[in-house]
Amino acid sequence: MLRQIIDSFDSAILAFLTHGALHTATYGHAVSHVADFYLFKGVLPLAMLCAIWFDTRERRQWQWQRQMVVATVLSGVLALFIGRVLAHYLPFRQRPLYDSSLHLTFPIAATPEAVLRTWSSFPSDHAMLWSAVAMGIFLVSRWMGVIALLQCAFLICLPRVYLGLHYPSDVLAGIILGAGVTCVVTRKPIMERFAPVIVRFIDRYPNVSYAGLFVILFELATTFDEPRELAQSIFRHVLHG
């Protein structure tokens, strides 16, 4: 019964997007670029985290804000990892782009076809990652958090549904799971176990710390695409010789 409700919901949303006035070649081309550009995915929310980190207007809350930034970054990494583990071990769900039973036509996505065909659609790891980051921002700054959540919804999640990369339920589940990860990691008893130590280390060794943080934020913004591709290349070379 639940599966039928979800399928009906997904089909209705996809039909609306693909048969509506927005389904044009020009709009599809623009959305494809928005979905593929890292600027619209990770750079904006991570820039907000940097702004929070260096915001010294409230000195009494400064250390807490920096601890929250650390916890948010960790939440994002953890959410991305959990999302890809779930996609690997849960029953495979074909992406709507390749489901001929839907009888829908989607714009061509920029992501390589081989990657799309072999990765399960559920849950959306992009939705998990960036909803986790957006929730962390929201817990520190309401107005910045609202912007981050809207950016996650309209510049990350909605384009991926429009392009047929995910079903609406994929991104909704990803948003809920990602935000949930942040809510757990940022709980005071949990955050106090690791965040203050990391902040003190950064304060004590700023040069090496900020260099390392730059690399971490870069990889997070690009969803660790290059390390993943390198690992897959090495694995294929070792496996096939």
Give names to the regions the model predicted:
Residues 76-88, 175, 179-186, 222:
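Transmembrane alpha-helical segments of multi-pass membrane transport proteins and ion-pumping complexes
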Residues 63-139, 143-151, 228-235:
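Membrane-interface loops
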Residues 89-98, 155-181, 229-236:
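Interfacial helix-loop-helix junctions of multi-pass membrane proteins
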